[in-house]
Design a protein with these regions (language model features):
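Soluble N-terminal interaction domains of secretory/endomembrane membrane proteins
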Residues: 1-135
Length: 135
């Protein structure tokens, strides 16, 4: 059971853009890592774009399960995990992250924000905390 990506996005007009993301690509071959990370960023944006405000969904993409939660204020979170990772845990994590993000980052910064301009550093910690260590 593994988490690969945790992203916070903003679903505004006309498109979705990434505000902050964390990735764990350590299980991939060194030469594949950047393309895997690119795929996860693209997939996260696409899924958030296709989801309605106020909705939750789980979408299978290749060998991954992508869990998306788009709040009614346009803030969205996407977790990309393997097929065995519990769906309920993913949505609990998304709830927690989006709630904390909305408290720490001003709503005025969401429409124009980018990973370089948004200061929110908790994603890497959540990604490693929610990894399930297999014995």
């Amino acid at each position: 059971m593994r988490l690969y990506s945790l992203s916070v996005l903003y679903k505004g007009d006309p498109k979705v853009h990434l505000l902050k993301a964390a990735y764990d690509v350590s299980t991939f071959n060194f030469f594949q890592r950047s393309s895997v990370q690119e795929f996860m960023t693209f997939t996260s944006q696409l899924i958030a774009e296709r989801s309605a405000l106020g909705s939750r969904a789980s979408v299978k993409e290749q060998e991954y399960l992508c869990h998306v939660y788009v709040r009614s204020d346009g803030l969205a979170g996407v977790v990309i995990a393997d097929n065995e990772y519990p769906q309920r845990v993913c949505f609990t994590l998304l709830d927690k992250v989006l709630e904390e993000f909305s408290r720490q980052v001003s709503k005025m910064d969401w429409p124009s924000g980018s990973p370089a301009t948004i200061s929110y550093s908790a994603l890497d910690g959540y990604l490693s905390k929610y990894q399930v260590q297999t014995p």
